[in-house]
């Protein structure tokens, strides 16, 4: 491999070498763009190199994907589900090396890396069952001898643009459902995790080849913003799923909507946990610790705001601070590590700038707030006491920084939870049914994910994942999210000899 090749023999198990072609187009590995390096964030050493796609490569891929869609849409949905089942089995067979690759290239700890790959496997399993349930409603017609019902058909091509923090799981949320729905998929992985894009695509491509199906049913492109912009503006792609910042997501939405396409946006989260005076404190502290520190604060569902009832404030803060001071930071592939590196050097600079902004706005660093001296991108998980009115509290700092604030009653806590532009995930710790049902009701949390007595992160695939407000409004993975990947037609059939008109209209 590259200069960081010690103990990386597992990469060969998933088809990776020192140099790799970064795009799978029309059933072939080809790319004519620049060569980029995949970097290990624990050491900032090169793992391997990848050749990116050009816009000409993209165009070739889109033409092939459009043609493949004509074949794929005619395959019965349960047969499409069988292909996705085989994809899940292929990923399952390489669960350990793929999980290690996620830990190596992204930086999350090994348990989380393996968990991420398990998530795409779970999405495959979920989608297999879904392939036999893509049914529409039968609607009573007001006209005699008429039948009215819904039919769901494929959209065509689904574009999927994923982010570095979940470099393959988010693909699974989208691609598995899109494929069983009869769509072809064009995937642009994150520019800084190209090896994951290549490795996952190799396994998917082998399944289509083994079943004598067009390779262009699944297209993968490693590249930068030019490829993403091409996907957003391409009228041949009726649906674009984008995961990233609210700032970039707004541009994607604007570009896609100008051509009357549809978007699924999974954008910034600024998630809060509320601890009431009747909470199970031990359960709350454990949950906060995982929610705020897991993945080094680089989940969209990371807890960034902690609201503590004034009567439990000191107790919770003391216990949480003690946990923070004991956390093991280091190589994510080593046993016992709980916090790996931030993904890039620029992320470390953002962390440092964030700490400076916190201090300038009156924040008090309880613990952490520093960068570790090392070759890697390691920072110390940080707890901050700060006013709820501080500007930094309204923003997402994509790092392990937790803002801690007091409240007096439930109404104030809910208002604080809802006071930020984002609306992804939220959780409350309480034992009172009245508090629980107010929290999940119309006067409670305004987020897309509303939890009770569990962390803000670690969502299951069976529910629809997504948020409100500046988080984008998208819903992916489970529940009825599949409907966004298909085209609904309302069909009315007259099986009689008369022509009664709706609303009793008599026309001639």
From Swiss-Prot:
- Give one GO molecular function term: aldehyde dehydrogenase (NAD+) activity
Q: Enumerate the catalysed reactions.
A: an aldehyde + NAD(+) + H2O = a carboxylate + NADH + 2 H(+)
Q: Per its UniProt entry, what is the enzyme's top EC class, as one word?
A: oxidoreductase
What keywords does the record list, in alphabetical order?
A: NAD, Oxidoreductase, Stress response
Q: Where is the active site?
A: 266, 300
Matching InterPro entries, A to Z? Ald_DH/histidinol_DH, Ald_DH_C, Ald_DH_CS_GLU, Ald_DH_N, Aldehyde_DH_dom, ALDH7A1-like
Does the keyword field hold Metal-binding? no
Q: Which CDD domains does the record cross-reference, listed alphabetically?
A: ALDH_F7_AASADH
Enzyme Commission designation: 1.2.1.3
Cite the position(s) of the site with description Transition state stabilizer. Answer: 165
The induction comment states:
By dehydration of shoots but not roots and not by heat shock or ABA.
Classification via SUPFAM superfamilies = ALDH-like (SSF53720)
- Which residues of the sequence carry a binding annotation for NAD(+)? 244-249
The family annotation for this protein states: Belongs to the aldehyde dehydrogenase family.
Assembly mode:
Homotetramer.
The entry's protein name is: Aldehyde dehydrogenase family 7 member A1
Give the originating organism.
Pisum sativum (Garden pea)
Q: Provide the taxonomic classification.
A: Eukaryota, Viridiplantae, Streptophyta, Embryophyta, Tracheophyta
């Amino acid at each position: 491999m590259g200069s960081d090749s010690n103990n990386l023999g597992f990469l060969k198990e998933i088809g990776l070498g020192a140099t790799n072609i970064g795009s799978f187009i029309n059933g072939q590995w080809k790319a004519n763009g620049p060569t980029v390096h995949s970097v290990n964030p624990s050491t900032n050493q090169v793992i391997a190199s990848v050749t990116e796609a050009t816009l000409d490569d993209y165009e070739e891929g889109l033409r092939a994907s459009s043609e493949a869609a004509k074949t794929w849409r005619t395959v019965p949905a349960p047969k499409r589900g069988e292909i996705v089942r085989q994809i899940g089995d292929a990923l399952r067979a390489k669960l350990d090396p793929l999980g290690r690759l996620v830990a190596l290239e992204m930086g999350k700890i090994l348990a989380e890396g393996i968990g991420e790959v398990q998530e795409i496997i779970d999405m495959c399993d979920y989608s297999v069952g879904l392939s036999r349930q893509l049914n529409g409603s039968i609607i009573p017609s007001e006209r005699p001898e008429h039948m009215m019902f819904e039919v769901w058909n494929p959209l065509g091509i689904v574009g999927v643009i994923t982010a570095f923090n979940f470099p393959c799981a988010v693909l699974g949320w989208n691609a598995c459902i899109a494929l069983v729905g009869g769509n072809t998929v064009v995937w642009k992985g994150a520019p800084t995790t190209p090896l994951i894009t290549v490795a996952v695509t190799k396994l998917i491509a082998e399944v289509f080849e083994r079943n004598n199906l067009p390779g262009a049913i699944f297209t993968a492109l490693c590249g930068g913003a030019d490829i993403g912009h091409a996907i957003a503006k391409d009228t041949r792609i009726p649906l674009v799923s984008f995961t990233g910042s609210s700032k970039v997501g707004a541009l994607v939405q604007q570009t896609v909507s100008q051509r009357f396409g549809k978007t699924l946006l999974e954008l910034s989260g600024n998630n809060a946990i509320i601890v009431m005076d009747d909470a199970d404190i031990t359960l709350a502290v454990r949950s906060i610790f995982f929610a705020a520190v897991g993945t080094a604060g680089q989940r969209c569902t990371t807890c960034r705001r902690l609201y503590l009832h004034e009567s439990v404030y000191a107790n919770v803060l003391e216990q949480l601070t003690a946990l923070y001071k004991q956390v093991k930071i280091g190589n994510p592939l080593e046993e016992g590590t709980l916090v790996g590196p931030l993904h890039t050097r620029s992320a470390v600079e953002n962390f440092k700038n964030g700490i400076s902004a916190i201090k300038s706005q009156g924040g008090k660093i309880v613990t952490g707030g520093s960068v570790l001296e090392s070759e890697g991108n390691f920072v110390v998980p940080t707890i901050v006491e700060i006013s709820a009115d501080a500007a930094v509290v309204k923003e997402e700092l994509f790092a392990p920084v937790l803002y801690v604030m007091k409240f007096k009653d439930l109404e104030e806590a809910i208002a604080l939870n809802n006071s930020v532009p984002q609306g992804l995930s939220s959780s409350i710790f309480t034992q009172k049914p009245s508090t629980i049902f107010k929290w999940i009701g119309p006067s409670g949390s305004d987020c897309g994910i509303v939890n009770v007595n569990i962390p803000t992160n670690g969502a299951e695939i069976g529910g629809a994942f997504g948020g409100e407000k500046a988080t984008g409004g998208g819903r992916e993975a489970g529940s009825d999210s599949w409907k966004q990947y298909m085209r609904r037609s309302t069909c009315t059939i007259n099986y009689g000899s008369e022509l009664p008109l709706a609303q009793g209209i008599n026309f001639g």
